[in-house]
């Protein structure tokens, strides 16, 4: 292949050729000889006859020989040596290189930068990466059977290839043996046997090529027959799975799928846990698919993309993508999807299938060592028996939990694997979000999931809905539980001496009463203070009557509120007033409210007539004089009050 070079005229047309020739003549002769040595070697190399010995590759690589003419190269060298031109660097060319063979550098150079960076960096989410030593999940039962069948097919193909190669070697050996049995070879053997005693001093070290060939030919068929005899019972032990032809509901193409009968513990054991024979229980139905392998793979990828898309959005259902109401944002699914999921899980549990994958609960996991062999089946049977015994023991120890699980063994193992992988990756076990760096090694669950777990009520608490939606609230906005609390000891009575006015305690008054009492006490008129004080006492008595009537109608409503009991003398006076001024005319029992740590709610406003208020006012004046006479010995005992 001729290489084209740039001529002097192509570089610059205004160059004086005479000046170039003078420059070349001025170069010393020794330098020219050194430059012309590699050119002479190339000419000698071209003059030699072409042969396969000169090339390491095949004949097809001989056409890429470099052909360099001395005239052009000399002119180019003169241009390089001149001062007015820039040297042109030739490519890194090696003469006997095989063209078309990809090099590591060329492959990396042809790749886009994104792919180069992806191959250089390790993908942390790949299950097969050795960097994080993550374990892959257990595939479903049908995929396990498919993998086992593929392995069996590969083994059978390799065995067939080995048999074919062995048969061809046997035929070649037969041909060689027929040649050895010819009369010429027999004469050679006889001559060799007669010639052997002459070398008796060498002993057994003598080399006999014909005898050695016969000995090898006899040993080879014996060695080939032994593995064939061992392979035949193995092929008989591996039964072929029945296949069915079905049509994919998505692409409308036909595909073959094996009929898989799940291995249940009832079929392996002669008797069930209930003592019934396995013949009475029908065998499990085979599992078939409506989609082909290609469409199922696409569906899994599509659902995975949808989950990633909805996971980033907050307040959106993971399944249908609709917005979740604000009151139910603690859930991941919307109400309709949660209801459908509950119904689906209930139907699966009723049919005795796994709630998560809808597979058989008693399906065994195939062992990796002995897949498709009878030994593996026996181990699976033993493992099923052990599982049944453990489940029976667990049911005897914990009868409330139930003997069987709602989730199959494969899903439980996969959940453990998923949690272990998330823990290795530094993510939360529940929501799979990245943990804070400060929580590495201390917590396996993120802060949000921990707070959600603390907020959720325990399972042992009964009547949780009543506690949540209870209408009983105090004035501070807190829910009250129906509990009785022992009251503290009663404080000293709030009665004053003769020169002090009577001040009722806050627990005996409502909000409106306190306002009226403060306004009347700040008025500054001493003559009006006593009637107003009596007015307050009369209003308080009537409010207490209504409060007692409401307690009879709703005894449970006021069980959580506190009201301190008044002194004995005031209780007697209140009983007399209640009997005399009861609205219904029926004597009521004295108020003995249950105790609690919070003050009572304000009673409803009163609606009093003018005549009724005048009667209470006149009666309060009469009672005030009696109270002063009765309180004199009491104040002698409590002089500070």
UniProtKB/Swiss-Prot annotation:
TM ranges: none
InterPro entries membership: Mediator_comp_sub12
GO cellular component, one term: nucleus
Biased composition (Pro residues): 486-495, 597-606
Phenotype reported upon loss of the gene: Stabilizes opaque cells at higher temperatures.
Region described as Disordered: spans on this chain: 13-38, 146-245, 258-287, 366-409, 480-507, 522-550, 568-641
Biased composition (Low complexity): 28-38, 151-160, 173-184, 216-242, 264-280, 569-579, 610-641
Alphabetically ordered keywords of this record: Metal-binding, Nucleus, Transcription, Transcription regulation, Zinc, Zinc-finger
Comp. bias regions, Basic and acidic residues: 379-400
PROSITE patterns on file: ZF_DKSA_2
GO molecular function: sequence-specific DNA binding; zinc ion binding
Zinc finger annotations (dksA C4-type) as residue ranges: 317-337
Induction context: Expression is induced in opaque cells and biofilm, and is regulated by WOR1.
An individual GO BP term: biological process involved in symbiotic interaction
Comp. bias intervals (Polar residues): 13-27, 161-172, 193-204, 522-533
Role of this protein: Transcription factor that modulates the white-opaque switch.
Protein name per UniProt: White-opaque regulator 3
Species annotation: Candida albicans (strain SC5314 / ATCC MYA-2876) (Yeast)
């Amino acid at each position: 292949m001729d290489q084209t070079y740039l001529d002097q005229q192509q570089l610059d047309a205004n160059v004086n050729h005479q000046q170039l020739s003078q420059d070349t003549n001025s170069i010393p002769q020794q330098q020219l000889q050194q430059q012309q040595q590699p050119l002479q070697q190339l000419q000698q190399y071209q003059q030699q006859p072409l042969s396969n010995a000169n090339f390491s590759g095949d004949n097809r690589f001989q056409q890429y020989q470099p052909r360099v003419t001395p005239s052009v190269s000399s002119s180019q060298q003169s241009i390089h040596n001149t001062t007015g031109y820039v040297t042109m660097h030739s490519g890194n060319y090696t003469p006997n290189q095989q063209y078309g063979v990809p090099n590591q550098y060329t492959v990396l150079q042809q790749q886009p930068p994104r792919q180069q960076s992806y191959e250089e960096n390790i993908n942390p989410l790949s299950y097969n990466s050795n960097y994080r030593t993550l374990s892959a999940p257990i595939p479903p039962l049908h995929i396990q059977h498919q993998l086992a069948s593929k392995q069996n097919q590969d083994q059978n193909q390799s065995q067939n290839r080995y048999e074919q190669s062995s048969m061809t070697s046997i035929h070649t050996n037969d041909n060689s043996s027929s040649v050895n049995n010819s009369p010429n070879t027999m004469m050679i053997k006889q001559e060799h046997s007669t010639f052997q005693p002459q070398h008796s001093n060498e002993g057994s070290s003598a080399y006999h090529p014909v005898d050695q060939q016969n000995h090898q030919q006899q040993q080879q068929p014996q060695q080939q027959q032994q593995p064939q005899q061992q392979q035949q019972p193995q092929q008989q032990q591996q039964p072929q799975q029945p296949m069915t032809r079905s049509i994919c509901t998505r692409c409308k193409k036909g595909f073959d799928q094996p009929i898989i009968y799940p291995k249940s513990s009832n079929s392996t054991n002669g008797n069930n846990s209930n003592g019934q024979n396995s013949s009475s229980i029908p065998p499990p139905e085979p599992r078939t698919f409506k989609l082909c392998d290609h469409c199922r793979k696409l569906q899994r990828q599509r659902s995975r993309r949808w989950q990633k898309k909805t996971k980033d959005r907050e307040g959106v259902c993971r399944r249908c993508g609709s917005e979740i109401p604000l009151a139910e944002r603690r859930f991941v699914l919307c109400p309709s999807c949660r209801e459908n999921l509950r119904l689906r899980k209930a139907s699966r549990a009723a049919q005795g299938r796994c709630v998560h994958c809808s597979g058989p609960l008693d399906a065994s996991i195939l062992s990796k060592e002995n897949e498709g062999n009878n030994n593996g089946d026996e181990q699976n049977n033993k493992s099923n028996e052990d599982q049944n015994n453990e489940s029976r023991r667990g049911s005897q120890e914990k009868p409330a939990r139930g003997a069987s699980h709602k989730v199959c063994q494969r899903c439980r193992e996969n959940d453990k694997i998923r949690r272990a992988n998330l823990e290795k990756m530094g993510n939360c076990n529940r929501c799979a979000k990245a943990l804070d760096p400060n929580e590495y090694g201390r917590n396996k669950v993120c802060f949000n999931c921990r707070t959600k777990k603390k907020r959720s009520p325990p399972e042992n608490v009964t009547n949780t809905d009543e506690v949540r939606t209870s209408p009983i609230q105090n004035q501070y906005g807190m829910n009250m539980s129906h509990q009785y609390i022992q009251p503290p000891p009663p404080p000293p009575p709030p009665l004053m001496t003769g020169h002090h006015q009577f001040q009722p305690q806050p627990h005996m008054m409502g909000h409106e009463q306190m306002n009226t009492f403060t306004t009347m006490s700040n008025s500054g008129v001493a003559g009006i203070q006593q009637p107003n004080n009596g007015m307050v006492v009369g209003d308080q008595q009537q409010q207490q009557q209504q409060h007692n009537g409401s307690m009879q109608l709703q005894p449970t409503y006021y069980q959580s509120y506190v009201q301190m009991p008044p002194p004995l003398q005031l209780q007697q006076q209140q009983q007399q007033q209640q009997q005399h001024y009861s609205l219904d005319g029926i004597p009521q029992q004295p108020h003995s409210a249950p105790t609690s740590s919070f003050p009572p709610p304000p009673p409803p406003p009163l609606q009093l007539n003018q005549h009724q208020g005048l009667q209470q006012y006149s009666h309060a004046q009469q009672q005030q004089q009696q109270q002063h006479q009765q309180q004199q010995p009491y104040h002698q005992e409590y002089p500070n009050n």
